[in-house]
Amino acid sequence: MTTERRLNATDTVELTVPADPAYLSVLRTVIASLAARRDFTLDEIDDLRIAVDEAGALLLPHAGPGSRVSAVFGGSADSLHAEVAVTVVPGKTGHLDRSSFAWLVLTALTDSVALDESGQRLSLVLTKARGARGQ
């Protein structure tokens, strides 16, 4: 007999993958799984999957050689957040273009997007609530 444990509000998932586009699929899979366990709709799950992929695509060009992408996923019973981060090339600022199409996609698919450019670390924090924006 098996018992499925529901994800609770204090559960977080942290992972690190090489800063390579081939590994963004791992981040997409994790966010989709967490959203499904929180009973997000299929459309909301797809929105999160695409948003995490876009966040990774925005960050990868700023990653230093041999860098890794770190991701922390968590939230509450009715929302999810994902923080995706890279270490930028030393001496290079990690400025992201907030007028780009990728940024537009991020803001359209999530409820909030926060950019943190602290030192040599560049991160995006995405948040999406279940049932938000008329879903």
Residues of each region from the PLM?
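Small/flexible residues
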Residues: 30, 39-40, 51, 70, ...
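Bergerat-fold GHKL ATPase/HATPase_c domain
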Residues: 1-47, 94
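Conserved beta-strand-loop-beta-strand hairpin that lines the nucleotide-binding pocket
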Residues: 1-14, 58-135
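Conserved ATP-binding N-box helix of the HATPase_c
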Residues: 42-65
